[in-house]
Amino acid sequence: VFRTTGDTEAGSEVEINEIQWVERELASHQLQGDHFFPSFNEFVFNWRYSEITATREAPDNRLYRYDAGEFSSRVDGNLRNFDALEDNASELGLDFTMAFYGPLNTIITPKVGYVSSEKTRDSEIRRFGFAFNGPLANDISLLVKPLEEILTPENITEQGFLIRELTRPTDNYKANNNLEAFYGQVEVNFD
């Protein structure tokens, strides 16, 4: 994705260029089985298992800003971000049912079951910006040039621009969610 916008802020023209590449992947696997044993009180056994993995990577998002034709010195105006996210989920479920025939033509059907679910998430973001540091960073003839001519290895020095990390503590996290459940019920049908 490439985006350029023009805007008016306090009477000056603003140009924001954003370059973004995002990779997404989803893998899902499921197995299930249904088993019926009519000679054993109509016993039914159902099971299911699933695994899902989803990933999102944005390896080098770039956002650059020019204010009134000059390379912007705003902290949020010149950024490079590296993002990675991975979600995993797995679930196992078991269900059992039997039929019993009672007095007065009643059918008693007990059902029991079990579910185990586990979900994890791992998110990592690294943020970098360019600090205006020395005389090169204040040279107007340099700041009006295209980005490829401003941020060259010769200009990323103590006399020009410094790369600084802007990653926040909340940009990286891990999360887990585990659930284990049992259920039981009885259904009685009167004929």
Where are the regions a protein language model picked out?
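Outer-membrane beta-barrel transmembrane strands
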Residues: 1, 17-60, 78-127, 162-191
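Flexible glycine-rich, low-complexity coil/linker segments exposed to the extracellular/periplasmic environment
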Residues: 73-74, 124-175
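Flexible, solvent-exposed coil segments and beta strand-coil junctions
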Residues: 4-15, 67-79, 158-168
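Flexible, surface-exposed loop regions and adjacent strand-edge segments
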Residues: 2-12, 61-71, 121, 126-136
